[in-house]
């Protein structure tokens, strides 16, 4: 790495972000899908259940489905060859940080690691060594008091601030605006990572906002509790990040989304600290100020502490699965589950293409009995039940509770599935589906290594529009890809991941072989934009839980209306009149060079 400036720093912490995470890909440095010496796909490292396992069926599926050759490699640029521009100089803020003994650094790699999230643009730019505008200084507050001091310093010395938690954003929320002329401070919350107290009587927990999800859950488990919030990013995302993006976890059916779990929070903004004066389950005291902070995406200030609900660890956790003859049958089953309000902790439905992809990711078995059992199961489904291989879809679920509750819940869902021509697939298949949850995020890196551009995105949609939205968006992505010159088959599948009374959350996975395209990222952008337009046209939302960031701002006016946008701008103007928190997420500030609204 080359940087033509002097590094200045004070009391820099040893951060897991810098030590064990990839700088240009998802997750841990030692974990990735790779090709072994026998030409099969395997998973490296030791952090996941599929680590060290071979997936003999995945390579042929991947190559045939996307028209690629895994022997062709699109290498990423080495970190040592990446050139980082010098930061915007601001000696006053450096002196301020030194005087107040606040940990900081302007070292190139540290700035780089905090200057991006995980969109396909972020990753391709890093792989190609195209480094955009980065934050100029990274600070690590060790207390709420230091957060206040840093904001005061930014206001006094003409700086901007972009907070960062786990860095898992997929909305360009962490990208520094190219138009920002001030020195930009990245406020890394990593040192604010402690549980402050656990209240066993009221079943609440107070924690600092920088605590990583898996650490929070691990510490609670040792005390006999769970927070119940389990997003797919739980290994790396933080409590403060969950609040800032209005996050959702896969077990929301039992425990709720983050807005249901928050009891109290502290929020530091340029005008001071926002906090309610009591920690109660509900208040009727005017509009709920928590709802202003939830989903604010670092545009108004930074979350410092949060009180959340906690729950005793359930006595029983059991997996389940179902196979349906087609996607429509599965969706109708989900709708009936919602009507009868008998959702298990988690319930997911994969369409046929995603079901086939999941089968391709099955690891090689050492047991001939397991292989035989799998063959018999497939014969039962296809030959005896008459399910068509190119229409089958599957659902996986998690039951949690005491043994009696789980037994009754499982029996009820099994009977309900039969009414919609479903076949019980058993706990083992359900458990395998959830085992893949955290490892599957690494698939995109494998694709990029071989010329594939891909992304996932989500929406929420009313029940009466789920089927049409899924069908129309998938068809549009394939049609638009062909129109944009993509000559190979396109990956376009979906799953229903959350069940609500009035609708569902739908996740789309999209990817294509970009070899031979001169402008692969531009093609990708045009396809994704068309897909999001189609989602809106089909009655879906701008996002269910990923948030808006910068990449979805163009739909904010359509989503919230002119008066709604005016209200958001008024809140911004009141809490942050100097635009200190200048991430440019959600809305554009009137008078800024990039203002469109």
Swiss-Prot record:
Q: What is this protein called?
A: Alkyldihydroxyacetonephosphate synthase
* GO function terms (MF aspect): alkylglycerone-phosphate synthase activity; FAD binding
Residues that bind FAD: 163-169, 232-238, 245-248, 297-303
PANTHER family assigned to the protein according to its UniProt record, in alphabetical order: ALKYLDIHYDROXYACETONEPHOSPHATE SYNTHASE, PEROXISOMAL (PTHR46568:SF1)
Which compartments does it reside in? Peroxisome
Q: Which gene encodes it?
A: ads-1
Q: What is its EC number?
A: 2.5.1.26
Domain FAD-binding PCMH-type: residue ranges = 131-313
Quote the catalytic activity from the record. Answer: a long chain fatty alcohol + a 1-acylglycerone 3-phosphate = a 1-O-alkylglycerone 3-phosphate + a long-chain fatty acid + H(+)
- Name its co-factor(s): FAD
Positions annotated to bind substrate: 444
Q: State its role.
A: Catalyzes the exchange of an acyl for a long-chain alkyl group and the formation of the ether bond in the biosynthesis of ether phospholipids.
What are the UniProt keywords, alphabetically? Answer: FAD, Flavoprotein, Lipid biosynthesis, Lipid metabolism, Peroxisome, Transferase
User: Catalytic center at which residues?
Assistant: 507 (proton donor/acceptor)
Task: Tell me how this protein assembles.
Answer: Homodimer.
Per the UniProt record, the site (Important for enzyme activity) maps to: 348
Q: Where is the signal peptide?
A: none
- In chain numbering, motif Microbody targeting signal lies across 595-597
Q: Pathway, per Swiss-Prot/TrEMBL?
A: Glycerolipid metabolism; ether lipid biosynthesis
Q: Where is this region: Important for enzyme activity?
A: 544-546
What SUPFAM superfamilies does the database record attribute to this sequence? FAD-binding/transporter-associated domain-like, FAD-linked oxidases, C-terminal domain
By sequence similarity, the record places it as follows: Belongs to the FAD-binding oxidoreductase/transferase type 4 family.
Q: Give the record's GO biological process terms.
A: ether lipid biosynthetic process; lipid biosynthetic process
Q: Which is a Pfam family this sequence falls into?
A: FAD_binding_4
